[in-house]
C-alpha cells in the first residue's frame, strides 16, 4: 500500500 510505504519511509 502507498500508506505503508510512506510510514516505512518515516
From Swiss-Prot:
Residues bearing PTM Methionine amide: 10
Protein's recorded name: Neurokinin-A
GO biological process, any: neuropeptide signaling pathway
Function: Tachykinins are active peptides which excite neurons, evoke behavioral responses, are potent vasodilators and secretagogues, and contract (directly or indirectly) many smooth muscles.
Recorded superkingdom: Eukaryota
Entry keywords, A to Z: Amidation, Neuropeptide, Secreted
GO cellular component, one term: extracellular region
Organism: Gadus morhua (Atlantic cod)
Amino acid at each position: 500500500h502507498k500508506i505503508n510505504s510512506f510510514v516505512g519511509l518515516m
